[in-house]
Amino acid sequence: MAAGIGTIAHGNDIGGSLRWPAHCNGVVTIKPTQGRVPAYNESAAAERPMPAHLMSAQGPLARSVGDVRLALEAMSQRDPRDPWWVPAPLVGPKPKGPIKVALAKLPDDMDVDASVHAALRQAADALERSGYRVSEVEVPDISGVWQTWCDIITNETVVLQEA
C-alpha cells in the first residue's frame, strides 16, 4: 500500500502492528477503540480470550487521513458474529467549548532528541492556533505497566497457541 499497490489496507494492533509500520512507511493509520471495528475471525481455531479482545483492534492503513476515515467508516459496520462490536458514531456532537489537548512533559531522565521536542512544540502551537486548548501535564510513573502488559501478552499467546 505504501508503494502504491493499493489504496487502503487492513491490519490489527495489540502492541503497535498498525502504528509502527505506518510510522516507518509514511502512511496513515488509527488504532480504533476496542469494539468499534468487528474482529470476528472465521478461520480461528478457538475464540480469543478476553484480554486479547480488550487489547487488539482492527484498523485501516492508507496514504491519506481522508482514506483512513473512509476505510474506518466501512470497517465499523455491524457484524452480528462479534459480540464486542458497539454502534459508536464516527462523529459526535459539536463540543461546547474548545477541545482540550494534553501535551505530556517528558521526564528529566528521558533522553529525547531536540528535533522531537521541537516537533511536539510545533504541533502544540498549530493546535492552539486552530482553537484547541493545549496544557502541559506531568507524565505519571508507569514503569511497572510495561512488565504487566508483557506478562498478559505472553500468557495470551500461550493460550492461543494451545487452542
Language model features: what each stretch is:
Residues M1-H23, L61-A62, L72:
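Active-site-proximal alpha-helical scaffold in enzymes
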Residues I14-G15, P140-I142:
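Conserved beta-strand edge residues that scaffold enzyme active sites
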Residues S17-L18, D111, G144:
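Generic structural signal for helix capping and beta-alpha/helix-loop junctions
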Residues R19-R36:
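Conserved catalytic cores of soluble enzyme domains
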Residues H23-V27, T148-T154:
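Short low-complexity, flexible loop/linker segments enriched in glycine and/or proline
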Residues K31-A124, S130, D141:
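A short helix-breaking turn/cap at a secondary-structure junction
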Residues P95-A104, I152-A163:
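Short helix-loop capping/hinge segments that flank enzyme active sites or metal/cofactor-binding pockets
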Residues R133-E138:
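General small-molecule cofactor/ligand-binding pocket signal
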